[in-house]
């Protein structure tokens, strides 16, 4: 589950309360919203598999979608319904779009590319076009730069490096 609290550990508030694996949350630039990824089992078979793994202290986050809510947990809604793993969300500095990593177009679970989507779940746009792993996008506060992790240009290995790109609207 997701919680918020003051930096000194006081005023702990639970944000989510549903069966599943919630995490990777970020606040919007104005602090009024939270974006996060979640794996929420629905069928009896999925629920059993999830609980069996959880009993061993494990999770299998292969099916994840993005969720958005107000910073107090109200108005929770699913932002994506793309399938596969949609994760590593981050707000555009305008607060009106989300950049995230996904393999929803992949047939074999790979590659992961970066995508952008409006807060209403519309206007999905692919940002990177590779056959590698692109994830963990973070904008500079002024929106001029994008930092992200990728295993591109590494000679076919799995080492992940940090890339910084000038952002073009």
Locate the predicted segments by residue.
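A detector of tandem-repeat and repeat-rich interaction/domain scaffolds
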Residues: 6, 77-78, 125-128, 145
């Amino acid at each position: 589950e997701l919680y918020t609290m003051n930096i000194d550990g006081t005023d702990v508030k639970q944000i989510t309360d549903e069966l599943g694996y919630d995490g990777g949350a970020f606040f919007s630039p104005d602090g009024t919203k939270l974006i996060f990824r979640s794996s929420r089992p629905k069928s009896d078979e999925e629920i059993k598999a999830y609980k069996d793994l959880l009993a061993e202290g494990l999770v299998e986050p292969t099916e994840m979608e993005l969720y958005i809510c107000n910073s107090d947990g109200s108005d929770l809604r699913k932002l994506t319904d793309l399938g596969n793993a949609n994760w590593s969300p981050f707000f555009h500095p305008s607060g009106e779009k989300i950049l995230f990593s996904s393999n929803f177009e992949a047939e074999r679970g790979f590659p992961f590319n970066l995508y952008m989507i409006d807060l209403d779940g519309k206007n999905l746009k692919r940002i990177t076009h590779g056959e590698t792993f692109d994830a963990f996008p973070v904008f500079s506060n002024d929106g001029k730069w994008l930092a992200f992790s990728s295993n591109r240009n590494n000679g076919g290995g799995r080492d992940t490096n940090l890339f910084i790109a000038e952002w073009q609207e």
